[in-house]
Amino acid sequence: MHYNKELIIKNINDGETFLGIEFGSTRIKAVLILEDGTPVAQGSHIWEKRLEHNIWTYHMDDIITGLQDCYQSLCKDILDKYDSQLTCLKGLGISAMMHGYLAFDKDNNLLVPFRTWRNTTTGEAANVLTNAFGFNIPERWSIAHLYQAVLNNEEHVNRIA
């Protein structure tokens, strides 16, 4: 379906759009779409992982400020293209890197620094899980990170909610 500019503006102003946000390895991306999936605006923020204590990670502050910058970039795109402001959405979806390790307690506190998909410190766990399931479990998968934390007797494991 082809949308003219006025119809897109109406959808934005009426809160009939959907926002998708993705925390990728190198960029945080935001895309505003119409109900049929047609993209109408986008924003992004470039970020860089950090190697700290031999763990690839992102700081929580990087996540928050990166999301804010990405959203601001999206809003600028909407203003530039449609002279409109985003004030209401019909739906919102957030995704993140498909592999990594984020462990939270019952109060939603991050227990250890975010371990990204780039970490390959889970060989023992990946082998045990692969043999147990009869299915290849790569070192980068979240389950391998969790089980390696168990095998390493990491102090945070018993507080995971």
Enumerate the predicted regions with their spans:
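N-terminal glycine/serine-rich phosphate-binding loop of ATP-dependent small-molecule kinases
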Residues: 1-112
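Glycine-rich phosphate-binding/catalytic subdomain of phosphoryl-transfer
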Residues: 73-161
